[in-house]
């Protein structure tokens, strides 16, 4: 074990003195993961992975199990908070050029994909109307795979439709994947501390470092406490804020909801999927909406790592954030004008960020050379 890892364990790791609050979300994500694993374990004790009993078992947890309603609500709200933190974490990485630490960025992208899969499997487990139909629609995208599509879909379903084997399989995957996420998180942290954390200026922090504890550990505690306060306020006053009303009805394969949609944190990808009127094209765009993050280190052309001193790049970045919110909003709307056109335009803007960013980098380099 290297000296860096010994320092990491003893919490004395030297860290740049100027890292801001945006660097606290990593520890908040780790706290969320621990909380989700613990609450998920207690829920799994009382949950029954059977299409006839799953919905009733969730009601049983809420009504009859001591403090079951707290466990269930923390787990459901915790998933949304988890995704809020991870999207901020990724946005911070894009803004400050942290993707230049390639190994950390790639392990983080793998973590995001695993997390999204885990959350999707978890959304199906209550076996409500939206759970069932979201599972049917999303898994049906596997049929878009040329030649093997139908075979892969039947194998994934465990039959010829979303049924009992599908639910049992999803429960097994939802139980085991968080431990995969925990393992990947360990790799992510070890890779990060091989080179050390960057800072808002994007410069080398070696000349000005302070011990992680107590300076940054107290900042982490403050942000984690704020996160818990937000969670418990939602739990106390608006426990169903992130829930879909359709999911309070038991799954019925004979009645299709008027508007099928996944949880809010998948809506940006779902909106991109819906904006393309071709099944294979939409599926590829859905996958690309997440995997395109892998291209960031290879398309960085600017001489300056961070966007702190790049006003043009900042404009492009905030356009991406606005686009992300717009796609999320349009995905909640029916597939009809003007939402179809807005969704298609927003999808083009979303992907154009990853094309415009390197072009803007070259432009900024030229401007800097002209002024120097």
UniProtKB/Swiss-Prot annotation:
Heme b b562 binds at residues 75, 174. The chain crosses the membrane at residues 25-45, 69-90, 105-125, 170-190, 218-238, 280-300, 312-332, 339-358. Its cofactor is heme b. Keywords: Electron transport, Heme, Iron, Membrane, Metal-binding, Mitochondrion, Mitochondrion inner membrane, Respiratory chain, Transmembrane, Transmembrane helix, Transport, Ubiquinone. Binds 2 heme b groups non-covalently. It is a multi-pass membrane protein. Signal peptide: none annotated. A ubiquinone binds at residue 193. Heme b b566 binds at residues 89, 188. The keyword Ligase does not apply. GO terms for molecular function: metal ion binding; ubiquinol-cytochrome-c reductase activity. GO terms for cellular component: mitochondrial inner membrane; respiratory chain complex III. Belongs to the cytochrome b family. The cytochrome bc1 complex contains 3 respiratory subunits (MT-CYB, CYC1 and UQCRFS1), 2 core proteins (UQCRC1 and UQCRC2) and probably 6 low-molecular weight proteins. Component of the ubiquinol-cytochrome c reductase complex (complex III or cytochrome b-c1 complex) that is part of the mitochondrial respiratory chain. The b-c1 complex mediates electron transfer from ubiquinol to cytochrome c. Contributes to the generation of a proton gradient across the mitochondrial membrane that is then used for ATP synthesis. This is Cytochrome b. It comes from Sinomicrurus japonicus.
């Amino acid at each position: 074990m290297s000296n860096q890892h010994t320092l990491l364990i003893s919490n004395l790791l030297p860290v740049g003195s100027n890292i801001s609050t945006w660097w606290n979300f990593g520890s908040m994500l780790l706290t969320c993961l621990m909380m989700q694993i613990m609450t998920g374990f207690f829920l799994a004790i009382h949950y029954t992975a059977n299409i006839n009993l799953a919905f009733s078992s969730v009601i049983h947890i809420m009504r009859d199990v001591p403090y079951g309603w707290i466990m269930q609500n923390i787990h459901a709200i915790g998933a949304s908070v988890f995704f809020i933190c991870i999207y901020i974490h990724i946005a911070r990485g894009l803004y400050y050029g942290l993707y230049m630490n390639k190994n950390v960025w790639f392990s983080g992208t793998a973590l995001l994909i695993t997390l999204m899969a885990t959350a999707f499997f978890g959304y199906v487990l209550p076996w409500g109307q939206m759970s069932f139909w979201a599972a049917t629609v999303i898994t049906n995208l596997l049929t878009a795979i040329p030649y093997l599509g139908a075979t892969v879909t039947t194998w994934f379903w465990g039959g010829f439709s979303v049924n009992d084997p599908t639910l049992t399989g999803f429960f097994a995957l939802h139980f085991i994947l968080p431990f995969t996420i925990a393992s990947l998180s360990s790799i992510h942290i070890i890779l990060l501390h091989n080179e050390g954390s960057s800072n808002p200026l994007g410069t080398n922090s070696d000349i000005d470092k302070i011990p992680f504890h107590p300076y940054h550990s107290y900042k982490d505690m403050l942000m984690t406490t704020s996160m818990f306060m937000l969670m418990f306020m939602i739990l106390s006053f608006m426990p169903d804020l992130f829930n879909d009303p359709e999911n309070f009805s038991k799954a019925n394969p004979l009645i299709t909801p008027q508007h099928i949609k996944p949880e809010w944190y998948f809506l940006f990808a779902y909106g991109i999927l819906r904006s393309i009127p071709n099944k294979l094209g939409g599926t590829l765009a859905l996958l690309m909406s997440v995997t395109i993050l892998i291209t960031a280190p290879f398309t960085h052309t600017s001489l300056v790592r961070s966007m702190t001193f790049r006003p043009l790049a900042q404009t492009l970045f905030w356009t991406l954030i606005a686009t992300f919110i717009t796609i999320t909003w349009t995905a909640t709307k029916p597939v009809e004008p003007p939402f179809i056109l807005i969704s298609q335009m927003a999808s083009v803007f979303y992907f154009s960020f990853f094309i415009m960013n390197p072009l803007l980098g070259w432009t900024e380099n030229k401007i800097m050379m002209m002024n120097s």
